[in-house]
Amino acid sequence: MRIDIVTLFPEMCENILNESIIGRARARGYLQVCCHQLRDYGEGVHKRVDDCTFGGGKGMLLMAQPIAKAFDEIIEQTAVRPHIVYMSPRGRVLDQEKVKELAKNENIIVLCGHYEGVDERVLEEYDVEEISIGDFVLTGGELPAVILTDAVARMLPGVLSEDVCFEEESHYDGLLEYPQYTRPSAWRGREVPQVLLNGHHEKIKKWRREQSLKVTQKARPDLFEKAELTAEEKRAFGRK
């Protein structure tokens, strides 16, 4: 997969995406990430990328022309037309289902907003999907772009050592992850649940499922109501 990030602060994205699992995935060729400086596509001698908004109002808006130039150059470099995403507080909130959907693309362009946003016409012209990471406002779209890239990259074959690594994590199957423990088995009077120490894999699997349901019911009742439960689980958790 190739992900192109169009931003005013490419170093901000590169510094994070060169580290840890994503950095190794890039080094091994499982993922290609290209960060593009939007000012390189700016207008005039001063490479201008923003202007005042029509109709008045405070703040500056990213212009359509530089963004379009960046998009066109990236599109020319890819065999399959990229799916284009704009990180925006008014977009659909990113969740694991959307991450799975995005991971099916061969190429993705991620546009990072700044100032008061971007000219609406460029979003319409390129059929851009708007995605948010939550109901709050950030200074720019760089951190959301990194979050999206990280989440999508983890779904790609070879990025993680084993498929089970992400299949058992929170949100992958719609539930939150069960509690986990490591050595020592006793710490400050708190014991690791005995079932995890007996080596009985079926019992461990059942315990983890029960704990995952309990955690989800308590912390995210909205997710719990959507989860697929067996008849036995419905009775145990009082769900119809």
Q: What residue ranges belong to the model's regions?
A:
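Hydrophobic/aromatic beta-strand patches that form the interior of the parallel beta-sheet core
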Residues: 4-6, 34-36, 85, 108-109, ...
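Short, surface-exposed acidic-centric catalytic microdomains
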Residues: 35-56
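Short, structured active-site "lid" loops
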Residues: 49-70
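Structured adenosyl-cofactor binding patch, chiefly the S-adenosyl-L-methionine
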Residues: 118, 122-169
